[in-house]
Amino acid sequence: MSYHNPYTPPRKSATFDDYTLAEIRRAAATGIYDIRGAGTKRKVPHFDDLLFLGASISRYPLEGYREKCDTSVVLGTRFAKKPIHLKIPITIAGMSFGALSGPAKEALGRGATASGTSTTTGDGGMTDEERGHSQTLVYQYLPSRYGMNPKDLRRADAIEVVVGQGAKPGGGGMLLGQKISDRVANMRNLPKGIDQRSACRHPDWTGPDDLEIKILELREITDWEKPIYVKVGGARPYYDTALAVKAGADVVVLDGMQGGTAATQDVFIENVGMPTLACIRPAVQALQDLGMHRKVQLVVSGGIRSGADVAKALALGADAVAIGTAALVAIGDNDPHWEEEYQKLGTTAGAYDDWHEGKDPAGITTQDPELMKRLDPVAAGRRLANYLKVMTLEAQTIARACGKNHLHNLEPEDLCALTMEAAAMAQVPLAGTSWYPGKGTF
């Protein structure tokens, strides 16, 4: 019989922690890989690892209540006849009808419109409610082509060609059968109740030269009026940004691994892609090397939560940001009000990510008619507008403290890093020094 010293409790493995052991047992019992929504849950270097250097003697701050700080941004100035003018540099990322309920899509449109910004469709096409309540709507053109309608291309204010997504760069999408309702099936030309797997690459091109041809096609369809965005997942941001610019993009959307998804394999979300913080500087460098920084706009997404995150992304060189998961939380996702029902689903408010199952108590990531009734799109849209207002005010507060009268005047020299990793990724000095690792390399 083995003896354990009472003063030395059994020690668990850091490699085989409780979660890892449970996952091994689950996989052994079911033979099925884990599917979930949202973005990575592992801790990665992020905007929290950066701080702003406020003005003191060497800089002149602005008065918060007397001196203005502009927040406007124009997207699509390169080729489009009708670029998009936004009041704030915070947009709503692409999330599909199907993954989200109709009321949720309407709420996103209402909130974005009230805030003077844009929202985006997603895999599966455009709904009339979304178009009707979105003053500025970006139409996603995806590899699956589900729900693609040339008439909707013309009804949109911009087109976003999706090449990749931060939560799963190199992977396609999925919408499980329980969310393929009659309406979703009709829009996507699919059988009701059958799992949908979306392609991971576009069927009519094999490389960047073909992307250029596709962009020209879309310009012809829309009479060169609409800005053309190209969205890529954060994997090789320097080269992907450069190739998107070469192909003729007006705007590059760069999505880091903290960006959410409706459903994919957990192993994909946690092990493929790069943190948002690591993606921005290489993309900006590519634009600068091509003489296109601020001429081709850069929109950054993936884990944007606050006005501080917005300000940091802009300081690193982005023109705007996009939010997805945060917007869903603002309209009611994972609300503790539904805690009892989350527990019945085997989870808790704040951790619910089984969006693919279509059982969301909040009525957001579901197609269940009874659950959808729980979400009031008018009230939810108002909450989103409030959240966007606060984010904007927070970003303005920081910009004024740094002596800037426009959010786009924020720059890397306004930042310092708390960790070596963040300093290397953001290419800003480690706090208390003028040094950062990896200068001149990506």
Swiss-Prot record:
CDD domains: GltS_FMN (cd02808). Keywords: Oxidoreductase. GO terms for molecular function: glutamate synthase activity. Residues 108-133 are annotated as: Disordered. InterPro entries: Aldolase_TIM, GltB, GltB_archl_type, Glu_synthdom. Residues 109-121 have a biased composition (Low complexity). Pfam families: Glu_synthase. GO terms for biological process: glutamate biosynthetic process. Disulfide bonds: none annotated. Coiled coil: none annotated. Belongs to the glutamate synthase family. This is Glutamate synthase large subunit-like protein. It comes from Rhizobium meliloti (strain 1021) (Ensifer meliloti).
